């Protein structure tokens, strides 16, 4: 593994961070536009997701708020300003700010499509204004049932058919995440939402 010292280059730092699954940190530091900010943030969110999914025995009974606070804590540890329950047209579950860039996230325990539907409507029609520096957001689906990919596929069909928006595959979490794009009611600009499963199912047979 590459060791860092005062003579290390950006390439050395990149190799070091990648070896530890933290390559998003360098991208966050170097982000000069909103697209780069969001790409790095999703790297941090994916890592936080994997950490939570690796401890389902201890997380499966957690409340929605507690799981969301754990997400915010993980993002804070990655160097972001990530706050829970900030007032922005309502009580937003996750608000991430970096300089002039911001990202809003809505989190729901996905027991039924009803919860996801209300969360998506809150995010897109109440919280986010769709400005160029706030052009993306996220839906976190805490899934405590078996077959998370099936539930995400069901939700994706609802997004497409009921809300009449375009959806795109997510290469980083195939089957467990997807994107939707629609016109923001406030700005009229494209607002991109990343819908993400967090698998918290725990039902051992022995």
Language-model features, listed with the residues they occupy:
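Active-site beta-strand-loop-beta-strand hairpin of nuclease catalytic cores
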Residues: 95-104
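Short, mixed charged/polar active-site loops
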Residues: 91, 102, 190-192
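Short, flexible loop/turn elements at secondary-structure junctions
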Residues: 98, 108-111, 199
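Hydrophobic, Leu/Ile/Phe/Ala-enriched alpha-helical segments that form helix-helix packing faces
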Residues: 45-52, 71-79, 127-130, 155, ...
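Domain-level recognition of nuclease-like catalytic cores that cleave nucleotide substrates
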Residues: 142-206
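Interdomain/boundary linker segments immediately adjacent to catalytic/signaling cores
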Residues: 1-65
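A short acidic/basic microdomain associated with nuclease active sites
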Residues: 57, 61, 68-93
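Catalytic cores of nucleic-acid endonucleases
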Residues: 109-163
């Amino acid at each position: 593994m590459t060791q860092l010292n005062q003579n290390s280059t950006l390439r050395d730092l990149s190799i070091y961070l990648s070896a530890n699954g933290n390559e998003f940190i360098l991208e966050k530091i170097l982000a000069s536009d909103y697209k780069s900010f969001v790409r790095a943030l999703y790297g941090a969110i994916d890592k936080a997701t994997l950490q939570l999914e690796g401890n389902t025995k201890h997380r499966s009974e957690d409340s929605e708020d507690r799981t969301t606070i754990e997400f915010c804590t993980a993002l804070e540890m990655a160097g972001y300003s990530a706050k829970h329950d900030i007032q922005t047209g309502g009580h937003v579950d996750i608000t991430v700010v970096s300089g002039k860039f911001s990202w809003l996230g809505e989190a729901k325990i996905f027991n039924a499509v009803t919860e996801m539907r209300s969360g998506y409507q809150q995010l897109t029609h109440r919280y986010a204004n769709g400005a160029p520096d706030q052009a993306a957001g996220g839906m976190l689906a805490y899934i405590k049932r078996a077959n998370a990919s099936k539930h995400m596929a069901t939700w994706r069909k609802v997004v497409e058919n009921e809300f009449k928006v375009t959806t795109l595959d997510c290469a980083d979490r195939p089957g467990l995440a997807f994107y939707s794009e629609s016109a923001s009611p406030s700005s009229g600009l494209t607002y991109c939402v990343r819908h993400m499963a967090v698998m918290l199912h725990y039902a051992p047979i022995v």
